């Protein structure tokens, strides 16, 4: 058994604090593996390999937060209309192989897209999920692993303006990277709520999880005590 929480729109720093709290609880065996699904307000996050002077081109008047993180990878953009998934998994139960874990996240994304009729794939030498001919990125991955417990995860473009990816940052360090969304590929409106059940099912399939939904309202601060204590109780 594992837990899944649907947090709705949640600030990046609040979600990061929650991940760290949960990771500590998972590491100690207080709670099982736990998966968070959410959306973020507009934010640019910087991975450990970000070169700010080369990658960031954010206008001074842009209403966007910028956060340095401990995840792998370079800079990326999060915003409403993007499904973000943060699996807090103990890799001692999932193979103790970080590269294989990232490949499984890609498999889960490809499965999610396939359920919606979108043909996602990998591109050699690049992390994330893409659509071929011409190559365009539809999902980003960046993870952190400490004591074999994972934080951060993936961001799947459902229906959002891709301009920040190309105008504000040199995403993934690729000058000419193209970006797309599920809505653009299907040529119809698509909501995060429509995509989320397929994402849950794909994670269950790829990681062999049985996800139990824990009731959660929109955001952090729902629990009077630390979340890991609440779930362990």
Q: Predicted regions: what is each one?
A:
Residues 1-138, 189-190, 220-233:
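N-terminal lobe of the biotin/lipoate ligase/transferase fold
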Residues 49-57, 65, 138-158, 162, ...:
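Short, conserved beta-strand/beta-arch hydrophobic-aromatic motifs that form part
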Residues 85-87, 127, 141-143, 154-158, ...:
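A structural signal for short, well-ordered beta-strand segments
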Residues 110, 146, 201:
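Short glycine-/small-residue-rich flexible loop motifs, especially phosphate/cofactor-binding loops
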Residues 130, 159-233:
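C-terminal accessory segment of soluble enzyme catalytic cores
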